[in-house]
From Swiss-Prot:
Species: Bacillus velezensis (strain DSM 23117 / BGSC 10A6 / LMG 26770 / FZB42) (Bacillus amyloliquefaciens subsp. plantarum)
Name of protein: HTH-type transcriptional regulator Hpr
Cross-referenced InterPro entries: HTH_MarR-typ, HTH_tscrpt_reg_Hpr, MarR/SlyA-like, Tscrpt_reg_MarR-type_CS, WH-like_DNA-bd_sf, WH_DNA-bd_sf
Domain HTH marR-type: 13-157
HAMAP family reported for this sequence: HTH_type_Hpr
Subunit structure: Homodimer.
Length: 203
């Protein structure tokens, strides 16, 4: 039986996948360190901050949505969400038209913490930002990473990318850059989707 040759060179495929793996690992090492340092004053870890981020964008996200868009196991999403609830940053709710699934929303305190983190973001402490400066100075913009975005889209799907792009749009709509810092826009000027009608769960 004749073996069908793949439409690519096997050695080329190995080199490409290893290049992606090793560069991604090196990049993540730097991202993880800077991300943790950013969160340290608030005593949050990366998973907790990611949950706050998704809850802010979706204005009522199910645990399965948190797991999917946060790229974490469902049990991880639930356990860290419970910890955030205990700290007063999240509340668990049910949708009036969906009693089966549990949804989470930011409390006022949780939203204040999330917004404070963004307002205190300092790009000079971010290695990826600093490492991209030569490209910015040469071309006048940061790398678009379109090819990487395409790869992620084919791995995680359109829903994942829609939330990713929506999160960037929301930050752009909700915040202004003033005097070298991010500032939350006033309610009149901010553009953000409202939450679906939810009812609280009694603990």
């Amino acid at each position: 039986m004749n073996r069908v040759e793949p439409p690519y060179d096997l050695k080329e495929a190995l080199i490409y996948t290893q290049k992606m793996a090793q560069l991604s690992k090196a990049l993540w090492k730097s991202i993880e360190k800077d991300w943790q340092n950013w969160l340290k004053p608030y005593d949050l870890n990366i998973n907790e901050h990611h949950i706050l981020w998704i809850a802010y964008q979706l204005k009522g996200a199910s645990i399965s949505e948190i797991a999917k868009f946060g790229v974490m196991h469902v049990s991880t999403a639930f356990n860290f969400s419970k910890k955030l609830e205990e700290r007063g940053y999240l509340k668990f709710s049910k949708r009036l038209n969906d009693k089966r699934n549990t949804y989470i929303q930011l409390t006022e305190e949780g939203e204040n913490v999330f917004e404070s983190l963004l307002e205190e973001f300092d790009p000079s402490r971010n290695a990826v930002f600093k490492g991209s400066q030569p490209i910015y100075h040469l071309f006048g913009k940061f790398p678009e990473v379109e090819e990487l975005t395409c790869v992620i889209r084919h791995i995680y799907g359109e829903d994942f990318m829609e939330i990713f792009e929506k999160s960037l749009t929301n930050i752009n709509n909700d915040f202004d850059s003033e005097d070298g810092r991010l500032k939350k826009k006033t309610d009149e000027s901010a553009v953000h989707e409202t939450a679906e009608e939810l009812e609280p769960i009694n603990s």
